[in-house]
């Protein structure tokens, strides 16, 4: 097998944000450990419900190609990046065949921690993911594939300059059309989020965020970059909405000066590798901004480059968020009961809580619809397209 390798696998249907976290974390761990780096499932990179083109706008080095089996044996090499962009812009990622089979490598699953609670059907059935850094990643043995969330900044912070090079956008796609001193881009996540009361950020979050941005610059203007233009128009009527090919959405975020973000992984690396970003606001408690009483879902998503806005519109530094979370852990019954499913009367209460939350969520959607039909528009709206 030769020199040892540390790597990860790009999974079918996985979003680009999650794939980039897996890639960056595994590559940084390999660098830290002095191992070769490799990836399995390279044909799945940047192929999902939003785009089928693959990673055409970056020349990513995917490391050693770790072979995965098909019903006829190995997946054919033609399915993988060749190191040279094709005429249509696809296949721009470099890969090197290593002869290593996936089944020859150890599998390591990042440690998880989940709360089973009544905040949603998902949290009742699958649990709410709240885990932080898994320190074991830093001492993994050679020839290991890493799986998991892998989104803690402590996995990769020391290699930020290298990450900028690894994720450099090809010049022909790297436009600064929306790099303006008084323009803030809202990255609104719609899609499957719109049916989840624990996830989908309310109109109030965005209005308070815009108000906070106006404190930085009273003349701040706003546009939306989203995967779901219909949801964006319904939630925030009056703001210009943009949704284009994957490269344009990514680059608009990367080259912005101001960002108001949703609880989605997609925007992190555009922000993290940006040379233009001056301020970014993200939802406090991340994926449970709407319902948390102090826990983070997950604490991996407390990042040094963001300020975090709570439900009342107050802003917190990453350091303040970590300090609050550590204090919460010492007194919260949730951490004491992590991993335990509710039973009996407690389970019945959780189901009732979940139904009430869904009911309130859909009543709020009805209210949004009524106000929109009555002509309400975002007070900060201005067409800057």
Task: Give the ranges of each region predicted by the language model.
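A structural signal for short, well-ordered beta-strand segments and their strand-loop junctions
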Residues: 7-8, 36-42, 185-187, 223-225, ...
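Conserved aromatic-histidine-acidic binding/catalytic patches
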Residues: 10-18, 197-201, 258
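Secretory-pathway luminal glycosyltransferase catalytic domains
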Residues: 4, 48-217, 315-385
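N-terminal pre-catalytic "stem/leader" segment of glycosyltransferase-like enzymes
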Residues: 2-49
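Catalytic binding pocket for nucleotide-activated donors in carbohydrate/polymer assembly enzymes
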Residues: 267, 272-339
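Short catalytic/ligand-binding loop motif for oxyanion handling, primarily in non-cytosolic enzymes
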Residues: 18, 39, 45-51, 154-155, ...
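Donor-binding and catalytic core of enzymes assembling or modifying cell-surface/extracellular glycoconjugates
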Residues: 16, 203-207, 211-300
């Amino acid at each position: 097998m030769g020199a040892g390798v540390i790597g990860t696998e790009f999974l079918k249907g996985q979003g680009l944000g999650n794939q980039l976290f897996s890639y960056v974390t595994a590559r940084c761990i390999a660098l830290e450990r002095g191992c070769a780096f490799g990836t399995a499932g390279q044909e799945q990179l940047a192929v999902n419900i939003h785009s089928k083109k693959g990673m055409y706008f970056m020349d990513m080095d995917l490391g050693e190609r770790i072979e995965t089996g098909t019903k006829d044996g190995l997946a054919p090499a033609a399915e993988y990046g060749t190191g040279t962009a094709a005429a249509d812009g696809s296949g721009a990622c470099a890969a090197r065949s290593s002869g290593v089979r996936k089944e020859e490598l150890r599998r390591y699953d990042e440690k998880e921690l989940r709360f089973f609670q009544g905040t949603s059907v998902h949290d009742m059935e699958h649990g709410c993911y709240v885990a932080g850094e898994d320190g074991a990643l830093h001492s993994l043995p050679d020839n290991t594939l890493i799986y998991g969330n892998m989104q803690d900044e402590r996995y990769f912070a020391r290699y930020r300059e290298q990450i900028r090079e690894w994720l450099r956008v090809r010049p022909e796609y790297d436009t600064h059309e929306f790099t303006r001193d008084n323009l803030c881009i809202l990255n609104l996540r719609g899609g499957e989020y719109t049916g989840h009361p624990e996830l989908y950020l309310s109109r109030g979050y965005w209005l308070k965020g815009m108000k906070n941005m106006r404190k930085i610059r009273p003349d701040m203007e706003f546009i939306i970059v989203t995967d779901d233009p219909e949801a964006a128009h319904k939630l925030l009527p009056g703001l210009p909405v943009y949704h284009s090919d994957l490269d344009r959405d990514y680059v608009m975020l990367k080259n912005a000066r101001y960002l108001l973000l949703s609880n989605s992984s997609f925007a992190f690396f555009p922000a993290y590798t940006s040379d233009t970003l001056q301020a970014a606001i993200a939802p406090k408690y991340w994926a449970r901004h709407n319902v948390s009483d102090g826990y983070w879902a997950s604490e991996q998503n407390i990042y040094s480059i963001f300020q975090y806005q709570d439900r009342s519109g107050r802003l917190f530094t990453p350091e303040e968020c970590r300090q609050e979370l550590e204090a919460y852990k010492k007194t919260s019954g949730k951490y004491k009961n992590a991993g335990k499913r509710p039973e009996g009367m407690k389970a019945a209460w959780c189901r009732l809580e979940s139904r009430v939350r869904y009911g309130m969520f859909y009543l709020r959607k009805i209210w949004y619809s009524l106000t929109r039909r009555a002509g309400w528009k975002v007070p900060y709206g201005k067409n800057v397209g």
